[in-house]
Amino acid sequence: MSVYSPRLRELVEGLRRLPGVGAKTAQRMALHLLQRDRDGARQLADALQRAVDGVGHCPECGLLTEEERCGLCASPQRRRTLLCVVESSADVFALEQATDFQGLYFVLGGALSPLDGIGPEELGLDRLQQRLEAGEVEEIILATNPTIEGEATAHYVQSLAAERGVRTTRIAHGVPMGGALEQVDQGTLSHAFMGRRDYEG
């Protein structure tokens, strides 16, 4: 017999879906919201519902947005000749905070992983190919994570760019191998970004 009521168990299991949240942390969060902060719980539930219903992906770059086009793609101040390819919206947020990059982004939504059934189609690489064929992009900056999947993805994107004569650079590896960009401190990320180099695959 479970000590949790059905609704409390449902809340704990829901919180466990969050990255880095285990059973004990989920239980602490649930108990805090129900015992000490019911108003906060209602605000959280409302904000989550609005985000789930109203936030989608920018059709140009894939960044999370509630607008028809994200603010970066819509901005006339951004350099359209520079395109930084990243795995997630979290990577865009990290780079925007740590660097003075003024180009545009392309968010893949993951990395190539054949064992997990993630191929070029699942990452929207056909849309990236169309952007390259339009001829506006002069340099692609590869900012995928330094993992096996991230490197495979970088190699694939580099081959697409090379076919169209687009220069490809890779952010420097001040970022630890096996790490995720969103978890790297701003100083390290800024140094890695400024030290990017040509990428030959």
From Swiss-Prot:
Q: Which UniProt keywords apply?
A: DNA damage, DNA recombination, DNA repair, Metal-binding, Zinc, Zinc-finger
Q: Where are the zinc fingers (C4-type)?
A: 58-73
Keyword flag Magnesium: no
One GO term of the biological process aspect: DNA repair
Q: Name one Pfam family in it.
A: Toprim_4
- Disulphide bridges: none
Q: What SMART domains does the record point to? A: TOPRIM
Domain Toprim, residue spans = 81-176
On whether Metal-binding is a keyword of this UniProt record, the answer is yes
Database matches in PANTHER family: RECOMBINATION PROTEIN RECR
Q: Which family does it belong to?
A: Belongs to the RecR family.
Q: What is this protein called?
A: Recombination protein RecR
